[in-house]
From Swiss-Prot:
Family affiliation: Belongs to the TrpR family.
GO molecular function: DNA-binding transcription factor activity; sequence-specific DNA binding
Originating organism: Chlamydia trachomatis serovar D (strain ATCC VR-885 / DSM 19411 / UW-3/Cx)
Entry protein name: Trp operon repressor homolog
Protein task: This protein is an aporepressor. When complexed with L-tryptophan it binds the operator region of the trp operon and prevents the initiation of transcription.
Amino acid sequence: MKNQEESGWQAFLTLCSKMQKEKFLQDLFSLFLSFSERKDVASRYHIIRALLEGELTQREIAEKYGVSIAQITRGSNALKGLDPQFKEFLQKEI
């Protein structure tokens, strides 16, 4: 089952990379992700961006974006394991 999940995820990523119009990408995510899942992704984006900027405390991030400290901790832990070049890319792009 794990190989099936991995190949499905890779196929999804490949499909995303083929979206040349933002509208198509929005439609694709609306097809595959529920409103709640899209909301969770948006929250994770705000958390990661705020952590990369480093200007707010975790409590301030929680208050500003209406997220839990646990969500922020998960985002922080995910950032710790990033390849330094990828982290630098994110800091420039986010």
